Amino acid sequence: MDVPRPAFKCFDDDGRLKRSGTVWTASAHIITAVIGSGVLSLAWAIGQLGWIAGPTVMLLFSFVTYYSSTLLSDCYRTGDPVSGKRNYTYMDAVRSILGGFRFKICGLIQYLNLFGITVGYTIAASISMMAIKRSNCFHESGGKNPCHMSSNPYMIMFGVTEILLSQIKDFDQIWWLSIVAAIMSFTYSAIGLALGIIQVAANGVVKGSLTGISIGAVTQTQKIWRTFQALGDIAFAYSYSVVLIEIQDTVRSPPAESKTMKIATRISIAVTTTFYMLCGCMGYAAFGDKAPGNLLTGFGFYNPFWLLDVANAAIVIHLVGAYQVFAQPIFAFIEKQAAARFPDSDLVTKEYEIRIPGFRSPYKVNVFRAVYRSGFVVLTTVISMLMPFFNDVVGILGALGFWPLTVYFPVEMYIRQRKVERWSMKWVCLQMLSCGCLMITLVAGVGSIAGVMLDLKVYKPFKTTY
């Protein structure tokens, strides 16, 4: 039976409904994916590097991220860039172009990165909850009570919330979640920027130095470690490559998806870099050598304290949902592996229906899912309580994800996809870029781990108060 020609207009070449994304929707998705809690540590990062190296390094990272993103956009289709087989995710592209072994390595790095991000988000959320409590306590006491408190109860509160949310299957697919995340991230970032500008105006002077935090405020060794760690913090702020292919999969064609995506990447990187520059530089200008690891906590108990409360509440709301966005892929992977290995186990595969008053459909409970997901959240919470160092964790995450996910795999896929000849000028330049970024990742990782070790010397697990 012949299918009427107009019917084809509803579907793309892979049989899926026709994609409708444009340059502007793709740009919006990228900006939403990039701007997040990483913006909070940029003032500290610039503070370690100074007025010359800080903005220069940020521009360098933005260029590398943009260039590697253009390489990755050419890998959306395997083979022919216009009519080749589509890759729906970053992992699909790695498996299709580079093959099984590197696919497994990429998966391991990606899941480690996701796990680390859930730990970082637990720490960041607890800091913001504690900041709200301390702010109100300080003002209620008229400034007489320093309101020292432990972050542990707030981490536990966050953990309990995540245990409940983690039982909702495919929570990360809820349509309004990304909208709420975008609104919240722009809210706290904009408030941080505005308060930085206000603080600079109140100081009447731009603080900071050309070379960053001065020797004396820290030792020579600490200066080196902090400089390295700052690279990791900036790298974390630009970590979005793993979602680029998925964003590209929403773009319509013609023109070719890669062409649209390159324009969208250029727009979004320009916008986010400008925003990052403003937030980081204004934070450093406001606090100088005392620029805090988390920008919003640096404003302490300044008025308007209610505005800081709004910003910190926005962080908590954002991170409650963002935790699930990063945890759910790990849940799905582990549960898929368990089902494949134990297909006949009721513990793994059987679902029990529970009727909940007020809901039409029964809630389906799987014993393995309930226990495993709860255990995962407990583990991330305990690790956060053992190492509640936001800056150090962000630096480690930036180091872990930047070179392999943002540079190495896109470069290798592009070389394979475009059949770039070994030892040609282009091949050599791409390998030099990859090696240079590997060095940055290594020193950032070393600096961040050194930061953790230094913090652990004075930190008593489960006992330290702020």
Swiss-Prot record:
<feature type="topological domain" description="Cytoplasmic">
    <location>
        <begin position="1"/>
        <end position="22"/>
    </location>
</feature>
<feature type="transmembrane region" description="Helical">
    <location>
        <begin position="227"/>
        <end position="247"/>
    </location>
</feature>
<feature type="transmembrane region" description="Helical">
    <location>
        <begin position="370"/>
        <end position="390"/>
    </location>
</feature>
<feature type="transmembrane region" description="Helical">
    <location>
        <begin position="23"/>
        <end position="43"/>
    </location>
</feature>
<feature type="topological domain" description="Extracellular">
    <location>
        <begin position="391"/>
        <end position="392"/>
    </location>
</feature>
<dbReference type="GO" id="GO:0015175">
    <property type="term" value="F:neutral L-amino acid transmembrane transporter activity"/>
</dbReference>
<dbReference type="InterPro" id="IPR013057">
    <property type="entry name" value="AA_transpt_TM"/>
</dbReference>
<dbReference type="GO" id="GO:0015399">
    <property type="term" value="F:primary active transmembrane transporter activity"/>
</dbReference>
<comment type="function">
    <text>Amino acid-proton symporter. Stereospecific transporter with a broad specificity for neutral amino acids, favoring small amino acids such as alanine, asparagine and glutamine. Also accepts large aromatic residues such as in phenlalanine or tyrosine.</text>
</comment>
<feature type="topological domain" description="Cytoplasmic">
    <location>
        <begin position="65"/>
        <end position="111"/>
    </location>
</feature>
<keyword id="KW-1003">Cell membrane</keyword>
<feature type="transmembrane region" description="Helical">
    <location>
        <begin position="44"/>
        <end position="64"/>
    </location>
</feature>
<feature type="transmembrane region" description="Helical">
    <location>
        <begin position="112"/>
        <end position="132"/>
    </location>
</feature>
<protein>
    <recommendedName>
        <fullName>Amino acid permease 4</fullName>
    </recommendedName>
</protein>
<dbReference type="GO" id="GO:0015293">
    <property type="term" value="F:symporter activity"/>
</dbReference>
<feature type="topological domain" description="Extracellular">
    <location>
        <begin position="133"/>
        <end position="177"/>
    </location>
</feature>
<feature type="topological domain" description="Extracellular">
    <location>
        <begin position="312"/>
        <end position="313"/>
    </location>
</feature>
<feature type="transmembrane region" description="Helical">
    <location>
        <begin position="436"/>
        <end position="456"/>
    </location>
</feature>
<dbReference type="GO" id="GO:0005886">
    <property type="term" value="C:plasma membrane"/>
</dbReference>
<feature type="topological domain" description="Extracellular">
    <location>
        <begin position="457"/>
        <end position="466"/>
    </location>
</feature>
<keyword id="KW-0813">Transport</keyword>
<feature type="topological domain" description="Cytoplasmic">
    <location>
        <begin position="335"/>
        <end position="369"/>
    </location>
</feature>
<feature type="transmembrane region" description="Helical">
    <location>
        <begin position="178"/>
        <end position="198"/>
    </location>
</feature>
<dbReference type="GO" id="GO:0006865">
    <property type="term" value="P:amino acid transport"/>
</dbReference>
<feature type="transmembrane region" description="Helical">
    <location>
        <begin position="393"/>
        <end position="413"/>
    </location>
</feature>
<feature type="topological domain" description="Cytoplasmic">
    <location>
        <begin position="288"/>
        <end position="290"/>
    </location>
</feature>
<feature type="transmembrane region" description="Helical">
    <location>
        <begin position="291"/>
        <end position="311"/>
    </location>
</feature>
<keyword id="KW-0029">Amino-acid transport</keyword>
<feature type="topological domain" description="Extracellular">
    <location>
        <begin position="248"/>
        <end position="266"/>
    </location>
</feature>
<keyword id="KW-1133">Transmembrane helix</keyword>
<dbReference type="Pfam" id="PF01490">
    <property type="entry name" value="Aa_trans"/>
</dbReference>
<feature type="transmembrane region" description="Helical">
    <location>
        <begin position="314"/>
        <end position="334"/>
    </location>
</feature>
<feature type="topological domain" description="Cytoplasmic">
    <location>
        <begin position="199"/>
        <end position="226"/>
    </location>
</feature>
<keyword id="KW-0472">Membrane</keyword>
<keyword id="KW-0769">Symport</keyword>
<keyword id="KW-0812">Transmembrane</keyword>
<dbReference type="GO" id="GO:0015172">
    <property type="term" value="F:acidic amino acid transmembrane transporter activity"/>
</dbReference>
<feature type="topological domain" description="Cytoplasmic">
    <location>
        <begin position="414"/>
        <end position="435"/>
    </location>
</feature>
<feature type="transmembrane region" description="Helical">
    <location>
        <begin position="267"/>
        <end position="287"/>
    </location>
</feature>
<comment type="similarity">
    <text>Belongs to the amino acid/polyamine transporter 2 family. Amino acid/auxin permease (AAAP) (TC 2.A.18.2) subfamily.</text>
</comment>
